Amino acid sequence: MYDYIIVGSGLFGAVCANELKKLNKKVLVIEKRNHIGGNAYTEDCEGIQIHKYGAHIFHTNDKYIWDYVNDLVEFNRFTNSPLAIYKDKLFNLPFNMNTFHQMWGVKDPQEAQNIINAQKKKYGDKVPENLEEQAISLVGEDLYQALIKGYTEKQWGRSAKELPAFIIKRIPVRFTFDNNYFSDRYQGIPVGGYTKLIEKMLEGVDVKLGIDFLKDKDSLASKAHRIIYTGPIDQYFDYRFGALEYRSLKFETERHEFPNFQGNAVINFTDANVPYTRIIEHKHFDYVETKHTVVTKEYPLEWKVGDEPYYPVNDNKNMELFKKYRELASREDKVIFGGRLAEYKYYDMHQVISAALYQVKNIMSTD
């Protein structure tokens, strides 16, 4: 008999397992896939660590979280400085003085601010009602049309006028010549990949791969006092109220027998007529000298039940539906729901680690 069965070996599940192990709890981790790590999983390709489910870059201002992961594995000093290509022209991201110079030829911050102020004037002082209005209020019409509109509409599969304004609030805008996408104090990627980090968390914990918990829920649940479930909350309840919506992704990975494909880890392709949103060249995340390179093209997809869920569509309709599932979950005495799928929430990696640590602390206070 286990004290806890944890369903899912992504970051939330792995952190919970690591913490419960320290408390001498008997833990079993069940994973539906044939590998650990969830979407943070990395796979070695002759020295290059492949981010199998899209780019994952760790960043945080929280020293406790940074120390937590660095106590487990070594991190490199990777800095995320993506580029964007629009009509064959390169732009720096995030939006900063380099971007403004590339778009308008300006050299000082006041010039750039004046152009943005003039371009957003048509909206006056009204609060932005959708993503398009929010984006123009941040960077003006020109940069919105070139670098945001096509990319975002590909990513979400709908008009920017139909998307909520809050989505674009995550995008940094700076009036300095600073290409570092994140402003966090700590940033990097585990040397040797994220799988090493998850392996370290799961050391000394029983792990079973290739097992779908929901296909044998009652039998498996009987083997533990409590369950920590990190899968989709709607699927747990058999889609009783209908499916929560997501966006999905398709990845096309190519190996090339030359050492350098694009010279940068991430390049966004913002033209609406280019079907993929970005190309990732994996070796630049944790640079290694090789005679080959591996790149991945990322294509956004409509999601349907059975597809891999990536980005929750947190509009009003879906959030109302989620509240119904959350109410059902609150009645499950034996089951604790946590992580991005169980909470129908977009998490950065440092946030999901923090949430898992808090969850274990909460469990221990009520156990």
Curated annotation (Swiss-Prot):
Outcome when changing residue 151 to F: 3-fold decrease in the mutase activity
Effect of residue 156 to A: Loss of mutase activity
Enzyme superclass (EC): isomerase
Protein keywords: FAD, Flavoprotein, Isomerase, Lipopolysaccharide biosynthesis
GO CC terms of this entry: cytosol
Swiss-Prot/TrEMBL cofactor(s): FAD
EC number per UniProt: 5.4.99.9
Domain of life: Bacteria
Binding site for FAD: 12, 31-32, 39, 56-57, 212-213, 340, 347-352
Role, per record: Catalyzes the interconversion through a 2-keto intermediate of uridine diphosphogalactopyranose (UDP-GalP) into uridine diphosphogalactofuranose (UDP-GalF).
Alphabetized NCBIfam families for the sequence: UDP-GALP_mutase
Family: Belongs to the UDP-galactopyranose/dTDP-fucopyranose mutase family.
Protein name stated in the entry: UDP-galactopyranose mutase
Organism the protein comes from: Escherichia coli (strain K12)
Lineage, opening ranks: Bacteria, Pseudomonadati, Pseudomonadota, Gammaproteobacteria, Enterobacterales
